Amino acid sequence: NTTAVNGEGGSKYIDAARNVVIKDTVKYAHLPIKHDFKLRGTLVFQSSGEPVLLNDKPIVVEKSFTAKKAEGSIDMEFVFDASGLQGKKIFVFEELFYENQTIAAAVHKDLGDVGQTVTVSNPKVKTVASNKVDGSKMLEPDKRVTILDTVSFSGLIEGHTYKVSGTLMDKATGNPVVDESGETIT
């Protein structure tokens, strides 16, 4: 029995960011006591079973342990860059070996197991700016106005804190708009 979750909060979602953590808890049973084992976990894409790569190498974590009881659990943490993986489902393959053996004593590679799957968030943001007075897109030149920017979003991770900030941009030039004192309008 295994469970993969966000290592920083326990949800089934991780941010599309650098240095994210997937915590994989592997529960075992019927192991011979006082024997040495090695647990190997590999991150793969659920859609294909192909490994998730970091610097062109599969992301693999190995952990050695001695079974103190026939039943127990082991945690493994995978730290990696998920910034380009928005919307992807990541699965953890596990293999259990007797120490110094090359053939796995137990394998868990069922891509359909939702307990082993973590989804990389795919946040979307949309803004609609309008004249606060009448809701139109028209502003009077040379008059002080307030622009209301309505922000809508989806795909955020529940329980995470996000910050919304904006800068008024000149559509024609692509440059920030500045006020009479030269300050960028935010």
Regions found by a protein language model. Name each.
Residues 1-186:
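Solvent-exposed loop/turn and edge beta-strand elements of beta-rich ligand-binding domains
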